[in-house]
Structure formats: structure tokens, C-alpha cells
Design a protein with these regions (language model features):
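Predominant activation on well-ordered alpha-helical scaffold segments within soluble catalytic domains
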Residues: 11, 28-35, 70-73, 120-123, ...
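Short polybasic/polar patches that bind polyanions
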Residues: 15, 35, 39, 77, ...
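A structured, mid-to-C-terminal "fold-capping" secondary-structure block
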Residues: 133-135, 139-194
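Charged/polar positions within long, soluble alpha-helices
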Residues: 39, 121-124, 185, 189-192
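Acidic/His-rich, divalent-metal-binding segments that scaffold phosphate/diphosphate chemistry
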Residues: 1-64
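Conserved active-site and cofactor/substrate-binding residues in soluble primary-metabolism enzymes
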Residues: 5, 9, 25-29, 67, ...
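Divalent metal-dependent catalytic cores for phosphoryl transfer on phosphate-bearing substrates
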Residues: 43-149, 159
Length: 194
């Protein structure tokens, strides 16, 4: 079992450096998505590690957007995160704001899913249900192809993430929809409690 900070310490660190509800919601979503992927890919015993990396992956973004993935090691050290944990967090910005390459399976999942959760979340907000529970792959693929929709979500990074995992783009899209369905209610409950 990999060492990681307990959830309450991780959440406190996230909230110390992030006040915007959007950033908190994104962190909680990526946490849930990473937990789902850990179980799905046969790493249930590492689910807490995967999820906590997801929770803290953007810990430095709100206050230091120009130093994203560069300020994170200092902040993560505040709660005693291991070098392995810090490497995983920093690897999600590979090629954009970090030279730390995602090499472990968990890092590749984070790299691929981070941008994609933003796209799926934006697509869900456009649906009558405001939810990804009834989202179909075909609907997401249309949004993916529309470069003007959720333009801040890099399609190139999402494609590269699928390639790094050895998956088709459709596999990544479909799995991440399922992952977001699994945590949508708990994320909404947590946001309502803020």
C-alpha cells in the first residue's frame, strides 16, 4: 500500500490554497474519478493513493497559475507527501507546465482524465438533466469534436492520454463517463455542504 496523506489533511491543504468553488469541485471530481479507475484497473488496494493524488493535483493552480506544477511540491511537503506522490501530481502537467513525464499507470490515468473531466462536466451542464448520469458516448463525442465547446479542455492532451494508456479515444471517453457517474452525487453533496 502506497503512503499518502489522510483525506482530512489533504482536503484541508486543498482548501487552504483554493477558495473558488469551481476549483474545489474539479478536485473532488478528479478524486472520485481516480478512485473509480483504481478499482476498475485492479488497484483497489491503492485507491486512497490514486484518489488523494486526484484531490490534490491542482493544489497550486488557483493561487499560482503561472507556477502550476512547480509550486505544488512545496505545498505538498507541508503535509508530508512522499516523492512518489509529488511526482504523480506534477506529471499531470507534462508538456504544458511540467517536464515530469507520466510513467506509472496511475499517472497516465490522471494525465488523460484531468482534462476530460472538464469536458464531461461542461457537457453535463448543457444537458436538461445537468448530469452525466444520462450522458451517452455519442453525445460526448460530438462535444469533443466541437473545438469551440469547452475550448479550454485540450483535446490533444486527452488524445495523448488515451495513447499513453494504450486505449482508443472511445475507451477513455466511455470509462471516464462511468467514473464521473460513480462520484457525481457525492461531489454534489460535498459542494452543497460548503
Amino acid at each position: 500500500m502506497r503512503a499518502c496523506p489522510d483525506r482530512s489533511s489533504a482536503l484541508a491543504l486543498l482548501k487552504k490554497y483554493n477558495a473558488e468553488p469551481f476549483h474545489i469541485q474539479h478536485a473532488l471530481t478528479v478524486e472520485g474519478v481516480m478512485r473509480w479507475y483504481a478499482a476498475e484497473l485492479g488497484h483497489a488496494d491503492e485507491a486512497d493513493f490514486w484518489a488523494t493524488v486526484g484531490l490534490l493535483h491542482d493544489v497550486d493552480f488557483e493561487k499560482w497559475p503561472e507556477e502550476h506544477c512547480k509550486k505544488a511540491p512545496e505545498l505538498l511537503a507541508e503535509i508530508g507527501c512522499s516523492d512518489e506522490f509529488i511526482h504523480a501530481v506534477c506529471s499531470h502537467g507534462y508538456g504544458l507546465c511540467s517536464d515530469v513525464e507520466p510513467t506509472a499507470e496511475m499517472e497516465k490515468v490522471l494525465f488523460a482524465a484531468d482534462e476530460l473531466t472538464g469536458l464531461i462536466g461542461a457537457a453535463a451542464r448543457m444537458r436538461p438533466s445537468k448530469s452525466c448520469q444520462d450522458m451517452e458516448l455519442s453525445s460526448l463525442k460530438k462535444k469533443f469534436k466541437d473545438k469551440k465547446f469547452a475550448a479550454g479542455c485540450s483535446r490533444d492532451v486527452i488524445r495523448e492520454g488515451a495513447e499513453r494508456l494504450g486505449w482508443t479515444l472511445d475507451e477513455l471517453l466511455e470509462k471516464t463517463i462511468l467514473a464521473m457517474r460513480s462520484c457525481e452525487d457525492s461531489v454534489n453533496e460535498a459542494m452543497a455542504a460548503l
